[in-house]
């Protein structure tokens, strides 16, 4: 079974606009709300793809009913520590004409230290039942910045593989505990590891150096419309998605993580891990709002994903 951790869950409000004008009038074509947060997105995708998943994080008392209803509607098993406050709401303005998304995200309610420690204890109580755990996304105020390092250490003690999808100090501190795989996007990777430039060759070279340093076993970097790469320091693969109509970009990176997790659960090799990830992301790009890929789309797209060795 795969587990996910979402310490800063939210409601995503996705507004579709045809031609965004800064400082001008913008009319919304479509508007939807989804329970979200990076780990929850991974869970939703895994659930749709047929992989058993255990979701965990904080439960904000002021938004308890709407959040639990969203989890129930999506058949997610959620282990949580309840805290005061309300779910943050993130506004995603997607311009379908330019295919550019502008995000306006709230920070999330403050979480006191005793609740953080309570979650670490909760996590330690169930992580040993998992094969893989995904740690992803931002953290709210009050949560220690080395939280992912602490959780990865607890998972490593139980022999559980960790996938880390964070940015900045959350990513770098998490690396100190040697997760199995990290999955930054292009911007996060360049910001944290400073390759010479943003070319595929330089990103792949820097990713291999990170693995060879012993910080992690694998590195995957998502590169937007270009696709994604995966390396174990020896072999490196690049996968490009098929042509398709993009309806929204939210959750695509989380779907890559879900696809990789599914391939790991099925015992697949690196090329298929990447193929699964890009196929899942492609399926999500076809959905509106923060809606994850459908299994039928994933299965149809899977043989269309081109994977090559670099």
Where are the model-predicted features located?
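Gly/Ala-rich phosphate-binding loop of Rossmann-like dinucleotide-binding domains
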Residues: 47, 156, 265
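Hydrophobic alpha-helical segments and helix pairs
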Residues: 112-150, 155
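Conserved phosphate/ATP/ADP-binding segment of small-molecule kinases
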Residues: 146-234
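Conserved N-terminal subdomain of the carbohydrate kinase-like
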Residues: 24, 48-130, 300-310
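Glycine-rich phosphate/adenosyl-contacting loop at the front of the ribokinase-like
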Residues: 1-56, 64-66
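Short beta-strands and strand-loop turn motifs
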Residues: 102-105, 130-137, 165, 183-186
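Short beta-strand scaffold segments in enzyme catalytic cores
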Residues: 44, 91-93, 227-231
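Conserved phosphate-binding/catalytic region of the ribokinase-like
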Residues: 172, 200-310
């Amino acid at each position: 079974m795969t587990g996910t951790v979402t310490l800063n869950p939210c409601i995503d409000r996705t507004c579709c606009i045809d031609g965004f004008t800064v400082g001008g009038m913008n009319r919304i074509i479509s508007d939807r709300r989804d329970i979200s947060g990076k780990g929850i997105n991974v869970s939703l995708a895994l659930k749709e793809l047929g992989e058993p998943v255990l979701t965990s994080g904080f439960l904000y008392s002021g938004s308890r009913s709407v959040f639990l209803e969203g989890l129930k509607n999506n058949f997610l098993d959620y282990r949580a520590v309840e805290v005061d406050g309300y779910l943050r709401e993130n506004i995603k303005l997607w311009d379908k004409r330019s295919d550019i998304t502008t995000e306006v995200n709230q920070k999330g309610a403050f979480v006191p230290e005793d609740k953080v420690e309570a979650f670490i204890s909760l996590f330690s109580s169930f992580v040993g039942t998992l094969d893989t755990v995904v740690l992803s996304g931002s953290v709210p105020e009050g949560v220690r910045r080395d939280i992912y390092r602490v959780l990865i250490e607890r998972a490593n003690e139980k022999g559980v593989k960790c996938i880390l999808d964070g940015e900045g100090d959350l990513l770098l501190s998490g690396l100190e505990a040697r997760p199995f795989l990290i999955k930054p996007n292009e911007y996060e990777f360049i910001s944290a590891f400073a390759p010479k430039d943003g070319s595929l060759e330089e990103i792949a070279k820097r990713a291999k150096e990170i693995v060879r340093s012993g910080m992690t076993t694998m590195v995957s970097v998502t590169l937007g419309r270009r696709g994604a790469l995966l390396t174990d320091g020896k072999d490196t693969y690049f996968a490009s998605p098929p042509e398709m109509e993009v309806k929204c970009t939210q959750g695509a990176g989380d779907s890559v993580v879900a696809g990789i997790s599914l391939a790991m659960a099925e015992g697949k090799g690196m090329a298929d891990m990447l193929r699964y990830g890009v196929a899942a992301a492609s399926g999500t790009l076809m959905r509106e709002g923060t809606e994850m890929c459908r299994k039928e789309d994933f299965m149809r797209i899977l043989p269309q994903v081109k994977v090559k060795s670099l």
